[in-house]
Curated annotation (Swiss-Prot):
Involved in oxygen transport from gills to the various peripheral tissues. Residues 3-147 form the Globin domain. GO terms for cellular component: blood microparticle; haptoglobin-hemoglobin complex; hemoglobin complex. This is Hemoglobin subunit beta-1. GO terms for biological process: hydrogen peroxide catabolic process. This fish has two hemoglobins: Hb1 (major) and Hb2. Hb1 has low oxygen affinity, it displays a pronounced Bohr effect, which is enhanced by ATP, and a pronounced Root effect. Keywords: Heme, Iron, Metal-binding, Oxygen transport, Transport. Signal peptide: none annotated. Red blood cells. The keyword Flavoprotein does not apply. Belongs to the globin family. Pfam families: Globin.
Length: 147
C-alpha cells in the first residue's frame, strides 16, 4: 500500500479539479501518439493518424484522451485502493488488448507535460512530485496483470 501525505492527497485532487479533461486528455494522448509513433499500432481503427495535424484533429483520439482522464479520476477517488481500482483495466489491457505496459509510462509522461503547461507557475516541483507519484502508482497498477 502506498503512503500518501496530506499534501499529496490534496494536490492530486486539486490538479484533477482544476484541469479541463476535454482539453488535457486529448492533448496528452495526441502528444503520446505523435512523440511515440509506435504506440499508434494499438489504434488502427482510429482512422487517419498519418501526421501530427491528423492526430490532433482526430475525434477518436480526443475521445480516448477523455476516457483516459476519467479513468485517472477513478484513481483520484480511490487513492488508497489503486491496485484494486485498476485491476479490471489491467486485465483488459494485458489479456485482451495486448498493450505493451511501457506505454502506460509514456502516456503518463505526456500527461505530466500537458498538465505542467496548463498549470504554469503553479506546477512547482512539489506539485510535480505528487502528480508523478500518483501516475507511477497508476502505471504500476495497470501493469500488475503483466507480472
Amino acid at each position: 500500500m502506498v503512503h500518501w501525505t496530506d499534501f499529496e492527497r490534496s494536490t492530486i485532487k486539486d490538479i484533477f479539479a482544476k484541469i479541463d479533461y476535454d482539453c488535457v486528455g486529448p492533448a496528452a494522448f495526441a502528444r503520446c501518439l505523435i512523440v511515440y509513433p509506435w504506440t499508434q499500432r494499438y489504434f488502427g481503427n482510429f482512422g487517419n493518424l498519418f501526421n501530427a495535424a491528423a492526430i490532433i484533429g482526430n475525434p477518436n483520439v480526443a475521445k480516448h484522451g477523455i476516457t483516459i482522464m476519467h479513468g485517472l479520476e477513478r484513481g483520484v477517488k480511490n487513492l488508497d485502493h489503486l491496485t484494486e481500482t485498476y485491476e479490471e483495466l489491467s486485465v483488459l489491457h494485458s489479456e485482451k488488448l495486448h498493450v505493451d505496459p511501457d506505454n502506460f509510462k509514456l502516456i503518463s509522461d505526456c500527461l505530466t507535460i500537458v498538465v505542467a503547461s496548463r498549470l504554469g507557475k503553479a506546477f512547482t516541483g512539489e506539485v510535480q512530485a505528487a502528480l508523478q507519484k500518483f501516475l507511477a502508482v497508476v502505471v504500476f497498477s495497470l501493469g500488475k496483470q503483466y507480472h
